[in-house]
């Protein structure tokens, strides 16, 4: 009986431990719910972190797989990522330096079967350091010493041109920063620089949210920001 009781206690403790979730050092128990990365309502299920809903900047909850939702000129979509498997064994047997394979902006060398760098907006490979992708979104490419692990870190936005030095920190903008240039107000978001509001002279500088369209007295149709 004693042996059975100890075994039961051991199994109970073991089951409790594996049902926990570790999110960047914070431990959650099975069934706990919390907001992750400011935009995801998640829960802990049997040791795995699962997304329940997406969260907008104002706190509105979106169902996974629901239609797009517009809030303050921003369009939100809550969808599960579809992952494509990639294997270095697909590289040619006699590979050369032109035989690179790519996965989610990571470049992998087929000769060494190691990470080579990250791919910027122009399709160039950055071996290490800052680089820019679409909408002036600033990233940092970090390749581990053994080149078997790589990470792309979000660093905000880059308020410069292709001729400017991407390492110039005076041109780096922190995430969620808002600034105005002329009649346009910009915001550095998750996907780079976007127009947030317009202050058109024809509307007496009244603030207009991005995604808004209006007809002027002369019949011209104007929009604030790009509407896809």
Swiss-Prot record:
- The source's superkingdom equals Eukaryota
Which residues does the record list as glycosylated?
135, 159
Q: Where, subcellularly, is it found?
A: Secreted, Extracellular space, Extracellular matrix, Basement membrane
Q: Would you tell me the Gene Ontology cellular component terms?
A: basement membrane; extracellular region
Tissue expression notes: Expressed in body wall muscle.
Q: Which UniProt keywords apply?
A: Basement membrane, Developmental protein, Extracellular matrix, Glycoprotein, Secreted, Signal
Q: Where is the signal peptide?
A: 1-19
| Pfam families the record matches | Fn1_2
**What job does the chain carry out?**
Required for the directional control of distal tip cell migration during gonadogenesis, probably by recruiting fibulin fbl-1 to the gonad basement membrane.
Q: Under which name does UniProt file this protein?
A: Abnormal cell migration protein 18
What organism is listed for this UniProt entry? Answer: Caenorhabditis elegans
Q: Which gene encodes it?
A: mig-18
């Amino acid at each position: 009986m004693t042996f059975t009781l100890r075994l039961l206690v051991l199994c109970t403790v073991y089951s409790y431990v594996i049902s926990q979730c570790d999110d960047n050092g914070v431990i959650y128990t099975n069934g706990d719910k919390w907001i992750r990365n400011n935009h995801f309502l998640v829960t802990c299920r049997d040791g795995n972190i699962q997304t329940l809903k997406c969260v907008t900047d104002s706190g509105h909850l979106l169902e996974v797989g629901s239609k797009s939702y517009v809030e303050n000129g921003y369009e939100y979509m809550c969808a599960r990522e579809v992952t494509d498997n990639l294997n270095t064994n697909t590289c040619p047997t006699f590979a050369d330096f032109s035989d690179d394979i790519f996965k989610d902006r990571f470049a992998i060398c087929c000769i060494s079967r190691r990470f080579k760098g990250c791919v910027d907006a122009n399709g160039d490979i950055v071996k290490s350091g800052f680089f820019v992708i679409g909408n002036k979104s600033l990233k940092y490419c970090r390749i581990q010493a053994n080149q078997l692990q790589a990470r792309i870190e979000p660093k905000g936005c880059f308020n410069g041109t292709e001729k400017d030095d991407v390492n110039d920190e005076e041109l780096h903008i922190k995430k969620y920063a808002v600034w105005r240039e002329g009649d346009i107000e910009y915001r550095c978001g998750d996907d780079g620089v976007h127009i947030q509001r317009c202050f058109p002279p024809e509307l007496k500088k009244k603030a207009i949210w991005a995604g808004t369209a209006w007809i002027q007295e002369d019949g011209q149709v104007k929009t604030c920001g790009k509407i896809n």
